[in-house]
UniProtKB/Swiss-Prot annotation:
Alphabetical list of PANTHER family matching this protein: RURM1 PROTEIN (PTHR14986)
Disulfide bonds: none
Reported modifications of this chain: C-terminal thiocarboxylation occurs in 2 steps, it is first acyl-adenylated (-COAMP) via the hesA/moeB/thiF part of UBA4, then thiocarboxylated (-COSH) via the rhodanese domain of UBA4.
InterPro entries with a match to the protein in the record: Beta-grasp_dom_sf, Mopterin_synth/thiamin_S_b, Urm1
Record SUPFAM superfamilies: MoaD/ThiS
Natural source organism: Debaryomyces hansenii (strain ATCC 36239 / CBS 767 / BCRC 21394 / JCM 1990 / NBRC 0083 / IGC 2968)
Pfam families named among the record's database cross-references: Urm1
Involved pathway(s): tRNA modification; 5-methoxycarbonylmethyl-2-thiouridine-tRNA biosynthesis
Gene designation: URM1
Protein name: Ubiquitin-related modifier 1
């Protein structure tokens, strides 16, 4: 049994997932709860298409600075960041705020 969530990559961040902006996922859950850290591990293992792109998304075990993270349209800083317990039906949006020029 897993947790069904929608993961979105916006602001050009979709390049790390073969240009796919929206992913409907079922995150495996053996027991207990899944936190955002578990979801981040799931994303790096299953959604990011090229391992060389992981540093575009992750730095020091968490989402890189410059990527806005929303949980159900609320800034993840207000939701507990990595400690947020992911629930079925959640929409998790990752938006790059850094753009080339």
């Amino acid at each position: 049994m897993g947790i069904k969530v929608k993961v979105e990559f916006l602001g050009g961040l979709d390049v790390i997932s073969n240009g796919v902006r929206e992913h409907k996922c079922e995150v495996p859950l053996e027991e207990g709860e899944a936190t955002m850290i578990d979801l981040i591990k799931y994303i790096t293992a299953t959604i990011i298409s090229d391992p060389k792109d992981v540093p575009v998304f992750i730095e020091e075990g968490t989402v890189r600075p410059g990527i806005l993270v929303l949980i159900n349209d609320t800034d993840w800083e207000l939701e507990g960041m990595e400690d947020y317990v992911v629930e079925s039906g959640d929409v998790l949006t990752f938006t790059s705020t850094l753009h080339g020029g």
